[in-house]
Amino acid sequence: MMKVLIVDDNASTREMVKIILQRTGHEVIGEAGDGDSAIKAFADLRPELVLLDIIMPGKSGIEVLSEIRGLDPAAKVIMLTAVDQDAVNSDLLSNGAAAIIYKPFSFDDFEKAFSKLK
């Protein structure tokens, strides 16, 4: 079981992710709807895993990933995105994302991404 922070500007997406995480035995310790809130929540809560959307108002998920890496280089971050572009994806992975889950997602997508954390 991991303590997880969910970051997505869409409340419905956050709720779906929360349900999947709870069904797989993980604990959602926080949620954020924008980049600045995400960084504050990460600093305050110190989750074991961050599920992070890329396209959000204000700071993008890419910027948030960089700031999280600055706070904790060992932080585990899985990106959530509808963007399936090789250049963006390789940039995310080279900047420390453990995996990428594409929207629309399924339960299996989370299991596959979580297996990359071990």
What do the predicted segments below correspond to?
Residues 7-8, 32, 50:
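Conserved sequence signature across two-component system core domains
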Residues 11-30, 95:
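Two-component/phosphorelay signaling modules centered on CheY-like receiver
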Residues 34-37, 60-63:
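Acidic catalytic/metal-coordinating carboxylates
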Residues 45-51:
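Active-site beta3 strand of CheY-like receiver
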Residues 57, 85:
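The feature encodes the CheY-like receiver
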Residues 105-114:
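C-terminal output helix
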